[in-house]
Amino acid sequence: CYIQNCPLGGKRAALDLDVRKCLPCGPGGKGRCFGPSICCGDELGCFVGTAEALRCQEENYLPSPCQSGQKPCGSGGRCAAAGICCSPDGCLADPSCHDEAAFSQ
């Protein structure tokens, strides 16, 4: 499950465990899921609501929490690609996400 929308028991347990990276997605598996319909990678940019992001729906059914991206940004989001901040609800342009170390992988 995405850490922001895990069931309470799962989210509480997440504080004690290492949060894993969300499922890989996109061409060649080079992206990471950021939400049920969002797949982003530093070389790919972001796919929102496209075939490349279909695999990201599987994450909703996995019990352990996941989080993609290194650097927090926006309102509960993480840097997903150059200049892009994503949360499970969507993506926005964010100049703080231009640092290469902030990308998804």
Curated annotation (Swiss-Prot):
Q: Which residues carry this modification: Glycine amide?
A: 9
Q: Which GO terms describe its cellular component?
A: extracellular space; secretory granule
Q: Name one GO biological process term.
A: response to food
User: Which Gene Ontology molecular-function terms are recorded?
Assistant: neurohypophyseal hormone activity; neuropeptide hormone activity; oxytocin receptor binding; V1A vasopressin receptor binding
For this UniProt record, the keywords arranged alphabetically read as follows: Amidation, Cleavage on pair of basic residues, Disulfide bond, Hormone, Secreted
Gene3D superfamilies, per this entry? Neurohypophysial hormone domain (2.60.9.10)
Cystines in this chain: 1-6, 22-66, 25-39, 33-56, 40-46, 73-85, 79-97, 86-91
Q: Which Pfam families match?
A: Hormone_4, Hormone_5
Q: Where in the cell is it found?
A: Secreted
SMART domains from the UniProt entry: NH
User: Anything else of interest in the record?
Assistant: 'GKR' has been placed at positions 10-12 by homology with the complete sequence of the other precursors.
Function field: Neurophysin 1 specifically binds oxytocin.
UniProt similarity note? Belongs to the vasopressin/oxytocin family.
Q: What is this protein called?
A: Oxytocin-neurophysin 1
